[in-house]
């Protein structure tokens, strides 16, 4: 039960951080491309790869990996934004966003893992 509560506590902080970045992006970045979600998901992928490479206790992994980074990253928002660009026939943004999100996420999770193994 303590692990579930730990993950939930971490998720609160991850969601607060995501909310802050998303609102900052709405005020300061172009609305033509979902920069905030891309930034959130790519940094989250890197950090999760890093966390995964380290020998943390299950408690810390639940707090940071499952909790904070689970609350921070947003797979569902990514896919809704992709659908929106497809629906609006904005195929160039759709393609670029999909490639950067999925390809970049995969590259950054491996890079985060590699950095974590070197430290």
From Swiss-Prot:
Which topology term describes how it sits in the membrane? Multi-pass membrane protein
Listed GO cellular component terms? plasma membrane
Q: Which parts of the chain span the membrane according to its record? A: 1-21, 33-53, 56-76, 93-113
Q: Which residues bind Na(+)?
A: 70, 73
Q: Molecular function terms in GO for this entry?
A: fluoride channel activity; metal ion binding
- Identify the keywords attached in UniProt to this record, alphabetized: Cell membrane, Ion channel, Ion transport, Membrane, Metal-binding, Sodium, Transmembrane, Transmembrane helix, Transport
Q: Which family does it belong to?
A: Belongs to the fluoride channel Fluc/FEX (TC 1.A.43) family.
Please explain the role this protein plays, according to its UniProt record.
Fluoride-specific ion channel. Important for reducing fluoride concentration in the cell, thus reducing its toxicity.
What is the protein named?
Fluoride-specific ion channel FluC 2
> What organism is this sequence from?
Lactobacillus johnsonii (strain CNCM I-12250 / La1 / NCC 533)
